Amino acid sequence: LIRGLQTSDDTHAKAEAFAKKVGKVAITARNSPGFAVNRILCPMINEAIFALQEGIATAEDLDAGMKLGCNHPIGPLALADMIGLDTMLSVMEVFYEGFNDPKYRPAPLLKEMVAAGHLGRKTGQGFYSYGK
């Protein structure tokens, strides 16, 4: 739930109750670029792209390392392909411009892949090939 400056406690409680009623678990965050989850997730994925670009490891090994070492159900590069590399680039650009912080600079490889039309699963090619 995104809680604005003028969101009353009553409104917040009603939204939380509705989420619970429809079987969801709500978290509350203030209104900020990327909110809570994407603010953590997207820079992690971007860093995996930097690691791939720098030749630290293959896409397969980076993903396997995060699955095994961090107990993630999917690796960051496979997840980027699922999200869409164009979407990932857009999010990172919003962060970079919104926070004016170099830690949010999109990886050059991400920009190159988007420019080449390699957007992930939706185009059949991203960090992995999907046979479309």
What is each of the regions a protein language model found here?
Residues 3-31, 35, 49-54, 58-132:
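NAD(P)-dependent Rossmann-like dehydrogenase/reductase catalytic/cofactor-binding core
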Residues 44-45:
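N-terminal alpha-helical segment
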